[in-house]
A protein has these predicted regions:
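Sec/Tat signal peptide C-region and signal peptidase I cleavage site
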Residues: 22-26
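Sequence-structural signature of mature extracellular/luminal beta-sheet repeat domains
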Residues: 27-344
Length: 344
Protein backbone atom coordinates (compact mmCIF):
# COMPACT_ATOMS: atom_id res chain seq x y z
CA UNK A 1 0.00 0.00 0.00
CA UNK A 2 1.19 3.50 -0.82
CA UNK A 3 -0.33 6.42 1.03
CA UNK A 4 -0.09 10.07 0.03
CA UNK A 5 -1.63 13.07 1.75
CA UNK A 6 -1.51 16.80 1.14
CA UNK A 7 1.93 18.18 2.05
CA UNK A 8 0.57 20.23 4.96
CA UNK A 9 -2.01 18.92 7.48
CA UNK A 10 -4.06 22.12 7.32
CA UNK A 11 -4.31 21.85 3.54
CA UNK A 12 -5.38 18.22 3.74
CA UNK A 13 -8.05 19.14 6.28
CA UNK A 14 -9.34 21.97 4.13
CA UNK A 15 -9.58 19.70 1.10
CA UNK A 16 -11.72 17.19 2.95
CA UNK A 17 -13.81 19.30 5.31
CA UNK A 18 -14.41 22.83 4.05
CA UNK A 19 -17.74 23.50 2.30
CA UNK A 20 -17.60 24.02 -1.42
CA UNK A 21 -17.10 27.58 -2.61
CA UNK A 22 -16.90 28.98 -6.12
CA UNK A 23 -15.08 26.52 -8.39
CA UNK A 24 -11.39 27.20 -8.65
CA UNK A 25 -8.40 25.65 -10.37
CA UNK A 26 -4.69 26.15 -10.67
CA UNK A 27 -3.45 27.40 -14.04
CA UNK A 28 0.26 27.10 -13.35
CA UNK A 29 2.64 24.19 -12.97
CA UNK A 30 5.25 25.85 -10.75
CA UNK A 31 3.96 25.00 -7.27
CA UNK A 32 3.14 21.36 -6.51
CA UNK A 33 -0.59 20.74 -6.46
CA UNK A 34 -2.36 19.54 -3.32
CA UNK A 35 -3.09 15.83 -3.22
CA UNK A 36 -6.07 13.87 -2.00
CA UNK A 37 -6.44 10.46 -0.39
CA UNK A 38 -4.20 7.44 -0.86
CA UNK A 39 -3.17 4.88 -3.45
CA UNK A 40 -3.48 1.26 -2.36
CA UNK A 41 -1.55 -1.44 -4.23
CA UNK A 42 -3.00 -4.93 -3.87
CA UNK A 43 -1.34 -6.80 -6.75
CA UNK A 44 2.17 -6.61 -8.26
CA UNK A 45 0.57 -5.95 -11.64
CA UNK A 46 -0.74 -2.62 -10.40
CA UNK A 47 2.74 -1.09 -10.73
CA UNK A 48 2.48 -1.60 -14.49
CA UNK A 49 -0.61 0.64 -14.49
CA UNK A 50 0.10 3.30 -11.86
CA UNK A 51 3.79 4.10 -11.30
CA UNK A 52 5.21 4.03 -7.76
CA UNK A 53 5.16 7.52 -6.34
CA UNK A 54 2.03 8.58 -8.22
CA UNK A 55 -0.36 10.84 -6.33
CA UNK A 56 -3.99 11.87 -6.63
CA UNK A 57 -3.50 15.51 -7.66
CA UNK A 58 -6.26 18.06 -7.13
CA UNK A 59 -6.83 20.16 -10.26
CA UNK A 60 -10.03 21.99 -9.30
CA UNK A 61 -12.15 22.38 -6.17
CA UNK A 62 -15.32 24.07 -4.96
CA UNK A 63 -17.63 22.07 -7.22
CA UNK A 64 -21.04 20.80 -6.13
CA UNK A 65 -20.96 17.30 -7.65
CA UNK A 66 -18.48 16.63 -10.45
CA UNK A 67 -19.34 13.89 -12.93
CA UNK A 68 -18.93 12.36 -16.37
CA UNK A 69 -15.43 13.45 -17.46
CA UNK A 70 -14.24 12.99 -21.03
CA UNK A 71 -10.97 13.93 -22.71
CA UNK A 72 -11.20 16.07 -25.83
CA UNK A 73 -8.17 15.70 -28.09
CA UNK A 74 -9.50 18.55 -30.23
CA UNK A 75 -9.52 20.92 -27.26
CA UNK A 76 -6.55 19.43 -25.44
CA UNK A 77 -8.70 19.52 -22.33
CA UNK A 78 -10.94 17.47 -20.09
CA UNK A 79 -14.65 18.28 -20.03
CA UNK A 80 -16.85 17.30 -17.09
CA UNK A 81 -20.29 17.97 -15.66
CA UNK A 82 -21.26 19.66 -12.44
CA UNK A 83 -24.74 18.20 -12.22
CA UNK A 84 -26.33 20.56 -9.64
CA UNK A 85 -24.75 23.60 -11.31
CA UNK A 86 -26.21 22.57 -14.70
CA UNK A 87 -22.79 23.25 -16.20
CA UNK A 88 -20.08 21.54 -18.22
CA UNK A 89 -16.65 22.77 -17.19
CA UNK A 90 -13.38 22.57 -19.10
CA UNK A 91 -9.99 22.08 -17.46
CA UNK A 92 -6.87 22.63 -19.54
CA UNK A 93 -3.21 22.49 -18.58
CA UNK A 94 -1.87 26.01 -18.16
CA UNK A 95 -5.34 27.57 -18.29
CA UNK A 96 -7.20 25.94 -15.42
CA UNK A 97 -10.97 25.79 -15.11
CA UNK A 98 -13.42 27.56 -17.40
CA UNK A 99 -17.12 27.21 -18.17
CA UNK A 100 -17.66 25.27 -21.39
CA UNK A 101 -21.45 25.00 -21.53
CA UNK A 102 -24.31 26.34 -19.40
CA UNK A 103 -27.05 25.23 -19.21
CA UNK A 104 -25.81 21.72 -19.78
CA UNK A 105 -28.76 19.44 -19.07
CA UNK A 106 -31.84 21.49 -18.29
CA UNK A 107 -33.04 24.31 -20.50
CA UNK A 108 -36.26 25.11 -18.63
CA UNK A 109 -36.85 28.29 -16.65
CA UNK A 110 -38.47 26.82 -13.52
CA UNK A 111 -36.56 24.89 -10.90
CA UNK A 112 -36.69 21.21 -11.85
CA UNK A 113 -34.55 19.17 -9.47
CA UNK A 114 -31.35 19.40 -7.48
CA UNK A 115 -29.53 17.32 -10.11
CA UNK A 116 -30.87 18.81 -13.33
CA UNK A 117 -27.67 19.22 -15.35
CA UNK A 118 -25.77 16.92 -17.66
CA UNK A 119 -24.11 13.83 -16.24
CA UNK A 120 -22.11 11.39 -18.36
CA UNK A 121 -20.21 12.77 -21.37
CA UNK A 122 -18.54 10.94 -24.23
CA UNK A 123 -17.66 11.41 -27.90
CA UNK A 124 -19.01 9.56 -30.91
CA UNK A 125 -16.89 8.57 -33.95
CA UNK A 126 -17.80 11.87 -35.64
CA UNK A 127 -16.31 13.84 -32.75
CA UNK A 128 -19.64 15.08 -31.40
CA UNK A 129 -20.02 15.51 -27.66
CA UNK A 130 -22.68 13.08 -26.44
CA UNK A 131 -24.36 14.21 -23.24
CA UNK A 132 -26.70 12.45 -20.81
CA UNK A 133 -29.08 15.16 -19.64
CA UNK A 134 -31.06 14.83 -16.43
CA UNK A 135 -33.42 17.79 -16.61
CA UNK A 136 -34.26 17.56 -20.31
CA UNK A 137 -34.39 13.75 -19.97
CA UNK A 138 -32.53 13.08 -23.19
CA UNK A 139 -29.32 12.18 -24.97
CA UNK A 140 -27.94 15.04 -27.02
CA UNK A 141 -25.12 15.59 -29.50
CA UNK A 142 -23.08 18.77 -29.86
CA UNK A 143 -20.55 19.42 -32.62
CA UNK A 144 -17.39 21.10 -31.35
CA UNK A 145 -16.80 22.57 -34.80
CA UNK A 146 -19.79 24.86 -34.34
CA UNK A 147 -23.06 25.28 -36.15
CA UNK A 148 -26.47 23.87 -35.34
CA UNK A 149 -26.20 23.78 -31.56
CA UNK A 150 -27.36 20.71 -29.68
CA UNK A 151 -29.31 17.98 -31.37
CA UNK A 152 -31.62 15.65 -29.45
CA UNK A 153 -30.71 12.05 -30.23
CA UNK A 154 -33.44 10.43 -28.14
CA UNK A 155 -35.77 11.62 -25.39
CA UNK A 156 -38.32 8.82 -25.17
CA UNK A 157 -38.81 5.07 -25.44
CA UNK A 158 -42.06 3.72 -26.85
CA UNK A 159 -43.67 7.13 -26.41
CA UNK A 160 -42.61 7.62 -22.78
CA UNK A 161 -39.97 10.03 -21.53
CA UNK A 162 -36.80 8.67 -19.98
CA UNK A 163 -36.18 9.02 -16.26
CA UNK A 164 -32.82 10.83 -16.34
CA UNK A 165 -30.14 9.41 -18.66
CA UNK A 166 -27.02 8.99 -16.57
CA UNK A 167 -24.02 7.57 -18.41
CA UNK A 168 -23.13 6.44 -21.92
CA UNK A 169 -20.46 4.78 -24.01
CA UNK A 170 -20.11 4.53 -27.78
CA UNK A 171 -18.81 1.66 -29.90
CA UNK A 172 -16.74 2.03 -33.05
CA UNK A 173 -19.84 1.78 -35.25
CA UNK A 174 -21.47 4.70 -33.45
CA UNK A 175 -24.00 2.76 -31.36
CA UNK A 176 -24.60 4.41 -27.99
CA UNK A 177 -25.20 2.34 -24.86
CA UNK A 178 -26.73 4.30 -21.99
CA UNK A 179 -28.32 3.91 -18.57
CA UNK A 180 -31.49 5.56 -17.29
CA UNK A 181 -31.84 5.57 -13.48
CA UNK A 182 -34.16 8.02 -11.67
CA UNK A 183 -31.62 10.21 -9.85
CA UNK A 184 -32.38 13.35 -11.85
CA UNK A 185 -36.14 13.28 -11.39
CA UNK A 186 -37.56 16.04 -9.16
CA UNK A 187 -38.08 13.62 -6.26
CA UNK A 188 -35.33 11.21 -7.24
CA UNK A 189 -36.00 7.47 -6.96
CA UNK A 190 -39.23 8.14 -5.05
CA UNK A 191 -40.74 10.24 -7.85
CA UNK A 192 -44.02 8.81 -9.11
CA UNK A 193 -45.52 12.07 -10.36
CA UNK A 194 -43.20 12.83 -13.29
CA UNK A 195 -41.91 9.34 -13.94
CA UNK A 196 -43.24 7.74 -17.14
CA UNK A 197 -41.13 4.56 -17.49
CA UNK A 198 -41.62 2.17 -14.55
CA UNK A 199 -38.17 0.60 -14.77
CA UNK A 200 -34.56 1.79 -14.77
CA UNK A 201 -33.20 0.54 -18.06
CA UNK A 202 -30.06 0.03 -20.06
CA UNK A 203 -30.57 0.96 -23.72
CA UNK A 204 -28.84 0.92 -27.09
CA UNK A 205 -29.27 3.73 -29.62
CA UNK A 206 -28.17 3.08 -33.21
CA UNK A 207 -26.83 5.80 -35.55
CA UNK A 208 -30.15 5.51 -37.41
CA UNK A 209 -32.07 6.43 -34.26
CA UNK A 210 -33.46 3.03 -33.24
CA UNK A 211 -33.64 2.50 -29.47
CA UNK A 212 -33.61 -0.99 -27.94
CA UNK A 213 -34.15 -1.84 -24.28
CA UNK A 214 -31.29 -4.18 -23.39
CA UNK A 215 -32.20 -4.93 -19.79
CA UNK A 216 -34.43 -3.67 -17.01
CA UNK A 217 -33.25 -6.17 -14.41
CA UNK A 218 -30.97 -3.76 -12.55
CA UNK A 219 -32.50 -1.69 -9.77
CA UNK A 220 -30.18 1.30 -10.25
CA UNK A 221 -27.99 0.97 -13.36
CA UNK A 222 -25.33 3.65 -13.50
CA UNK A 223 -21.93 3.62 -15.22
CA UNK A 224 -21.51 1.76 -18.50
CA UNK A 225 -18.48 0.78 -20.57
CA UNK A 226 -17.39 -1.62 -23.32
CA UNK A 227 -14.50 -4.07 -23.37
CA UNK A 228 -11.77 -3.32 -25.95
CA UNK A 229 -13.10 -6.00 -28.32
CA UNK A 230 -16.65 -4.68 -27.81
CA UNK A 231 -17.89 -8.15 -26.91
CA UNK A 232 -18.72 -7.32 -23.28
CA UNK A 233 -20.82 -4.52 -21.80
CA UNK A 234 -20.05 -3.58 -18.21
CA UNK A 235 -22.74 -1.91 -16.10
CA UNK A 236 -22.41 -0.57 -12.57
CA UNK A 237 -25.30 -0.86 -10.14
CA UNK A 238 -25.44 1.86 -7.48
CA UNK A 239 -27.67 -0.02 -5.06
CA UNK A 240 -26.54 -0.19 -1.43
CA UNK A 241 -28.24 -3.59 -1.07
CA UNK A 242 -26.57 -4.97 -4.22
CA UNK A 243 -23.55 -2.80 -5.00
CA UNK A 244 -21.88 -4.51 -7.92
CA UNK A 245 -20.53 -4.45 -11.45
CA UNK A 246 -22.16 -6.65 -14.07
CA UNK A 247 -20.58 -8.08 -17.23
CA UNK A 248 -22.91 -8.85 -20.14
CA UNK A 249 -21.77 -10.69 -23.28
CA UNK A 250 -22.88 -8.79 -26.38
CA UNK A 251 -24.50 -10.56 -29.30
CA UNK A 252 -23.55 -9.38 -32.82
CA UNK A 253 -26.89 -7.54 -33.08
CA UNK A 254 -26.11 -5.52 -29.95
CA UNK A 255 -28.47 -7.34 -27.59
CA UNK A 256 -27.26 -8.84 -24.32
CA UNK A 257 -26.73 -12.40 -23.23
CA UNK A 258 -27.39 -13.17 -19.55
CA UNK A 259 -24.91 -11.27 -17.40
CA UNK A 260 -22.67 -12.29 -14.54
CA UNK A 261 -21.52 -10.44 -11.46
CA UNK A 262 -17.97 -9.28 -12.12
CA UNK A 263 -17.40 -7.84 -8.65
CA UNK A 264 -19.60 -7.32 -5.59
CA UNK A 265 -18.84 -4.58 -3.04
CA UNK A 266 -22.12 -4.68 -1.13
CA UNK A 267 -20.38 -5.46 2.17
CA UNK A 268 -17.89 -2.66 1.59
CA UNK A 269 -20.64 -0.18 0.72
CA UNK A 270 -22.63 -1.11 3.81
CA UNK A 271 -19.72 -1.07 6.23
CA UNK A 272 -19.96 2.65 6.94
CA UNK A 273 -16.22 3.02 6.37
CA UNK A 274 -16.32 3.97 2.69
CA UNK A 275 -18.34 6.65 0.93
CA UNK A 276 -20.01 6.11 -2.41
CA UNK A 277 -21.44 3.31 -4.53
CA UNK A 278 -20.54 1.80 -7.92
CA UNK A 279 -20.86 4.65 -10.38
CA UNK A 280 -18.97 5.58 -13.55
CA UNK A 281 -16.30 3.36 -15.09
CA UNK A 282 -13.84 3.15 -17.96
CA UNK A 283 -11.90 0.28 -19.54
CA UNK A 284 -8.27 0.59 -20.60
CA UNK A 285 -6.79 -0.96 -23.78
CA UNK A 286 -5.73 -4.05 -21.81
CA UNK A 287 -9.27 -4.63 -20.61
CA UNK A 288 -8.77 -3.50 -17.02
CA UNK A 289 -11.70 -1.72 -15.41
CA UNK A 290 -11.26 1.61 -13.63
CA UNK A 291 -14.54 1.80 -11.74
CA UNK A 292 -15.63 4.39 -9.22
CA UNK A 293 -17.20 2.88 -6.14
CA UNK A 294 -17.00 2.83 -2.35
CA UNK A 295 -13.97 4.89 -1.33
CA UNK A 296 -12.76 5.94 -4.77
CA UNK A 297 -11.62 4.15 -7.94
CA UNK A 298 -11.40 0.34 -7.99
CA UNK A 299 -8.94 -1.00 -10.55
CA UNK A 300 -9.84 -4.53 -11.66
CA UNK A 301 -8.61 -7.05 -14.18
CA UNK A 302 -11.00 -8.21 -16.93
CA UNK A 303 -11.76 -11.19 -14.69
CA UNK A 304 -12.77 -8.93 -11.80
CA UNK A 305 -9.62 -9.32 -9.69
CA UNK A 306 -8.97 -6.20 -7.62
CA UNK A 307 -5.50 -4.88 -8.44
CA UNK A 308 -5.56 -1.67 -6.45
CA UNK A 309 -7.64 1.29 -5.36
CA UNK A 310 -7.31 5.03 -5.73
CA UNK A 311 -8.94 6.05 -2.47
CA UNK A 312 -10.26 9.61 -2.45
CA UNK A 313 -12.13 9.28 0.87
CA UNK A 314 -15.13 11.01 -0.73
CA UNK A 315 -17.99 9.85 -2.97
CA UNK A 316 -16.47 9.49 -6.43
CA UNK A 317 -18.63 9.79 -9.54
CA UNK A 318 -16.63 8.92 -12.63
CA UNK A 319 -13.25 8.93 -14.37
CA UNK A 320 -11.66 9.00 -17.81
CA UNK A 321 -8.32 8.56 -19.49
CA UNK A 322 -6.77 11.67 -20.96
CA UNK A 323 -3.75 13.70 -21.87
CA UNK A 324 -1.99 13.82 -25.26
CA UNK A 325 -0.77 10.24 -24.73
CA UNK A 326 -3.55 9.03 -22.44
CA UNK A 327 -1.06 9.31 -19.60
CA UNK A 328 -3.51 10.43 -16.92
CA UNK A 329 -6.66 9.19 -15.26
CA UNK A 330 -8.95 12.15 -14.55
CA UNK A 331 -11.28 11.62 -11.60
CA UNK A 332 -14.47 13.41 -10.62
CA UNK A 333 -14.60 13.09 -6.83
CA UNK A 334 -17.42 15.01 -5.19
CA UNK A 335 -16.31 18.68 -5.08
CA UNK A 336 -12.98 18.00 -6.79
CA UNK A 337 -11.49 17.24 -10.17
CA UNK A 338 -8.34 15.16 -9.73
CA UNK A 339 -5.88 13.21 -11.81
CA UNK A 340 -3.40 10.38 -11.38
CA UNK A 341 -0.33 9.77 -13.52
CA UNK A 342 -0.41 6.43 -15.35
CA UNK A 343 2.26 4.24 -16.87
CA UNK A 344 2.34 5.11 -20.62
Amino acid sequence: MQTFFAPFPALALSLLLLPAAAPSARADDVTPRPVLGEIIRLDPGFDALVPPGAKIEVLASGLDWSEGPVWSAALGAVLFSDVPQNTVFQWKEGEGLTTFLKPSGYTGTNTYSRESGSNGLTFDPAGRLISCEHGDRRLSALSLSGGGGKRTLTDHFEGKRYNSPNDACVDRAGNIYFTDPPYGLPKGPADVDTREIPWNGVYRLTPEGKVTLLTKELKFPNGVALSPDEKTLYVAQSDVTAALWMAYPLHPDGTLAPGRILADVTAMAGSGKYKGLPDGLKVDPKGNLWATGPGGVHVMSPEGKLLGRLETFVPTGNCCFGGPHQEYLYICADAWLCRVKLVP
